[in-house]
Amino acid sequence: MKDLNPEMGKFATTKGPPQDNRGMVDIATLPNFPANRSGTPREEMYLAPNKMETPRILNMNMVPDYLQKENFSPDFSSATVSAKSSPVNVTHDESLPLGTIESNSTKDSKYAVQRQQQQVVDFIENNMQLLSSETLNFRSDIMKTLELPIPKRRDIKGNHLSKLLFAKSPLTINTYCQFYDRRTKRICNQEMIWKDKNSREKHGSRKYQRHLSKVHDVQLTPNNFTEFFDHNSPLFQECYDYQSRLMRDLLVEPDAKFKEKKKKKKGDVNGNHPETGSSLINHQVQQQNVRELQSKIAMNDLIEILIDLNIPFSVLDYQPMRNWLIKYSIISTDTLPDEVYFKTDPGVNELEHNSSNLNNSNSGTPHNHNQNQHTN
């Protein structure tokens, strides 16, 4: 191999084994790479690379094999130049395309996002059972505390009937549809989510009516809205108690109700009963006579029972027995009926006389006083 030495002015020939020149690459042979640069190597270190001079490797076949790496862009950081070319050290930033750097950073960020998403998926899968159980427990607590809104007259007369089919809970601001499907025997219980209470009160009627129309295909009226409840549910029975006067007062016309109150007030002023129209004094006397008659009938029944069981009438003088009679209105005073009361019914006298004779014969000792007592 011959080398030209400009200082010696002659050719020098070196002998020996062939040297490995793979590390020595003429940078001018690279595609689209500028061979000539102005300035000294020290100045070029501070010069920004021109975009037009950035090497663009379109085909990897143009790059020598020893510079190629699998799945990576070629690295020119170790390349050197020969003596004929300018002694420029090619850095990694100068040789590596900008698009490759951006693509690598984009891939890294994409992989980071994918790793985060996978972590979230793994966490959800591992804790799905716990989350689902907590959600179910919270929903069951809500269902236990549901309350139907108490109807008001403006709800019956206005366009707010749909609000009456949605129950509320103190645990959340959301509401739950209580429409009862008679075919499936199930309550809807669909949750209506609200941002706050103001939006619920402001837009509740329209949203509820839209749900009832689209999902259940029903139109509510003051006469049929109670038909869409489950009448056997405690929730309905607590709010719509027909034994109370809730629904009856709501459905009665205000004018008719006012007339009834006025009529009742007028009857009280005149001293007449509002229903019968009779005098209140006569009505009280009639009630007293009815109570006395009921007491007399009950006392006769009690006497017949005592005679059938051979129980002496002296048991009626027993104070607990007397209290029991007063409690159940069999007698109205502390004094029991006298003998005249028993003598008024001859059947009672005869039964009592037979009962006394039976008691005397069983005891073996005559009671002349009792026999004389029942002898006329």
UniProtKB/Swiss-Prot annotation:
GO terms of biological process kind: aerobic respiration; mitochondrial transcription; transcription by RNA polymerase II
Induction section of the entry: During respiratory growth.
Pfam families per record: RSF
Region Disordered, residue ranges: 1-23, 88-107, 258-279, 347-376
Annotated S-S bridges: none
Superkingdom, taxonomy of origin: Eukaryota
InterPro entries (alphabetical): Rsf1_fungi
Keywords of the record: Activator, Cytoplasm, Mitochondrion, Nucleus, Transcription, Transcription regulation
Subcellular location: Cytoplasm; Nucleus; Mitochondrion
GO cellular component: mitochondrion; nucleus
Bias kind Low complexity: ranges: 354-376
Function: Mitochondrial and nuclear transcriptional activator required for respiratory growth.
Record protein name field: Respiration factor 1
Gene: RSF1
